[in-house]
Design a protein with these regions (language model features):
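Intrinsically disordered, low-complexity regions enriched in small/polar residues
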Residues: 12-15, 25, 29, 51, ...
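Immediate post-signal-peptide N-terminus of mature secreted/exported proteins
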Residues: 20-67
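Intrinsically disordered, low-complexity repeat segments enriched in small/polar residues
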Residues: 5, 9-10, 39, 63, ...
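Surface-exposed, polar helix/loop patches in the mature regions of secreted/periplasmic/lumenal proteins
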Residues: 71-156
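Short alpha-helical "patches" and their helix-cap loops
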Residues: 5, 67-71
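Generic alpha-helix detector with strongest preference for long hydrophobic helices that associate
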Residues: 4-7, 28, 32, 91
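Bacterial Sec-dependent N-terminal signal peptides
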Residues: 1-22
Length: 158
């Protein structure tokens, strides 16, 4: 299912999808997971983060940018999905590692989101809401340039 979604998103991205098509697909898929009682806790927590992040992205973009393009929202949504997929695959791989190694890997992802802000938002209560709890499966900043964050993580994990 994930592979299909990523392939679909990539196909739409490269074919010049209609306005906000990728953003809408990622958002709607996350909402479907949240609204499906059969979704497991892990899937629901990841979906909740995606919905929160995409809602924040759209709201902040319209607040701070004179002109928000569909491409801007689509690119961020695409790289958010790529980042989350890569994060999940790295967590699965790290099951065989020590708890310290696993925590170090999570910190690489967390640091990439904090170190690559998109808007420079100073409202730490909002942007770090998923970090401050300390128990989140997705301990990431909402104010993130997902394309840069993904590149930063991949560079560190080479």
């Amino acid at each position: 299912m994930k592979a299909f979604l990523i392939t679909l998103i990539f196909a739409l991205f490269t074919m010049g999808a209609t306005a906000q098509e990728i953003y809408k697909i990622v958002y709607q898929n996350a909402e479907q997971v949240l609204n499906n009682p059969a979704s497991g806790v892990t899937k629901a927590r990841i979906a909740q983060f995606k919905v929160s992040q995409l809602t924040y992205l759209r709201q902040k973009a319209f607040e701070t940018m004179p002109e928000v393009t569909d491409r801007f929202l689509d690119v961020q949504a695409y790289y958010l999905s790529e980042f989350m997929t890569f994060y999940q695959s790295e967590l699965v791989k790290s099951n065989k590692e020590t708890p310290e190694e696993r925590a170090k890997k999570v910190m690489i992802f967390l640091d990439a989101t904090v170190s690559n802000p998109l808007f420079g938002d100073t409202d730490e209560e909002t942007i770090y809401a998923y970090i401050k709890e300390g128990t989140e499966l997705t301990p990431f900043s909402l104010d993130t340039d997902w394309q840069k964050a993904l590149a930063a993580v991949k560079a560190q994990l080479k």
